[in-house]
Design a protein with these regions (language model features):
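Short, conserved active-site loop motifs that form the nucleotide-linked donor/cofactor pocket
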Residues: 34, 76-77, 221-223, 284
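Internal hydrophobic alpha-helix adjacent to the cofactor/substrate pocket in enzyme cavities
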Residues: 182, 303-329
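FAD-binding core/adjacent interface of flavoenzyme oxidoreductases
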Residues: 2-7, 74-160, 242
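A Rossmann-like FAD-binding core segment of flavoenzymes
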Residues: 79-86, 102, 179-274, 323-325
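Beta1-alpha1 glycine-rich phosphate/pyrophosphate-binding loop at the start
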Residues: 2-77, 162-163, 171-205
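Short glycine-rich anion-binding loops that position phosphate/pyrophosphate groups of nucleotides
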Residues: 18, 112-115, 247-249
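FAD-site-proximal beta/loop scaffold in flavoenzymes
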Residues: 124-155, 235-309, 313
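Predominantly flavin-linked oxidoreductase catalytic cores and closely associated redox partners
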Residues: 120-220, 224-226, 231-232
């Protein structure tokens, strides 16, 4: 006997933390008659909490990434290597940059956010913390040049590192990169500065976390400039710019013609209710950085991780027509 055709198609768009949890649990919890499809341009997705450890040299790159095609194979899901070009939530379909149109019964978005680094003088190496694929390429090249540098001057000029962004990514990346550079070449002096437009680092985090971060920065010799907006003309001279500021929604989310009538915040992030559903289209869910909770949350991976089990329960409930579960963000992490 041939297998019955699927009754519902569930599309997971984005290789994020929450979707990894859905895929891991799917073999044990999948309801009958559901086709699961995963769409992402990135086959290997980083666990964001381990990226600083990779930058510092504690982990290899393969240690910090999640192999999504392998997860899909174990879950019996179809893997589609493509990015969203357009969403029509009224027609319940995605148009992909591959040219494929993908219809869905339920859609979950876990596509993260993006960064737009500035255009700098060619003499400045710019490393944006997203996307990871570009960060890896740029960082590998930087370390290769750093180790190959002659460093034979009697009093070599310090290498100037500037990190922009006072969130967790900015703080952790400058500490990790400075430590890596000094460890690889203790003969070459490194000067570092972190710049943020906010009044302190780690806004929205507990005061204890801010104190620990400031202490670590001080011990590493990283100067901190607060209340400063980065501009090309006013930025201090640097050799390496670490860009971790201004998380943005993806272009299709910011463009009305490419997102249809999907409700988004003024910045383009998908507005969700207490059950992680779109406030305008209940067949669309959104989690992690791409989503806008009614009380804005920091763009930190720990939230997407904690959203994962709730997302799984609510996707299954939607497919089966049962009650949804409310999400309560953690207050400590």
């Amino acid at each position: 006997m041939s297998a019955s055709p699927p009754v519902h198609r569930l599309v997971l768009a984005g290789a994020g933390h929450a979707h990894a949890q859905v895929l891991k649990a799917w073999p044990d919890r999948a309801p009958p008659g559901v086709e699961l499809v995963v769409v992402s341009p990135h086959a290997m997705a980083p666990y964001s909490g381990m990226v600083p450890g990779w930058l510092a040299g504690t982990y290899g790159f393969q240690d910090i990434v999640i192999d999504f095609p392998a997860l899909c194979a174990r879950a019996g899901a179809r893997w589609v290597p493509a990015a969203i070009d357009r969403l029509d939530p009224d027609r319940q379909c995605l148009e992909l940059d591959s040219g494929e149109t993908l219809h869905y019964d339920f859609l979950s978005l876990n596509t993260g956010s993006t960064l737009v680094p500035p255009v700098c003088d060619p003499s400045v190496t710019v490393l944006s913390m997203r996307p990871l694929s570009q960060l890896k390429t740029g960082y590998d090249q930087l370390l290769e040049r750093w180790q190959a540098g002659a460093g034979t001057d009697a009093e070599p000029r310090p290498v100037r590192v500037l990190a922009v962004g006072g969130g967790a990514a900015g703080v952790e990346s400058v500490l990790a990169v400075v430590n890596r550079l000094r460890t690889l070449r203790p003969d070459r002096p490194v000067q570092a500065e972190l710049q943020t437009r906010g009044p302190t680092v780690l806004p929205g985090y507990p005061s204890g976390a801010r104190r620990l971060a400031l202490r670590a920065l001080q011990q590493a010799g990283v100067a901190v400039r607060t209340g400063t907006r980065w501009t090309t003309g006013s930025a201090p001279a640097c050799d390496l710019l670490l860009w971790a500021a201004g998380a943005q929604a993806h272009a299709w989310q910011r463009t009305p013609q490419r997102r249809g009538r999907l409700a988004v915040s003024p910045e383009g992030f998908v507005q969700i209710d207490g059950c992680l559903r779109s406030v305008s289209h209940p067949r669309v869910f959104a989690v992690g950085d791409c989503a806008h909770w009614h009380q804005p949350l920091p763009k930190a991976g720990v939230y997407a991780v904690r959203m994962g089990p709730v997302l799984l329960d609510n996707l299954l409930a939607s497919l089966q027509g049962t009650a949804l579960r409310a999400y309560a963000p953690q207050t400590r992490f």
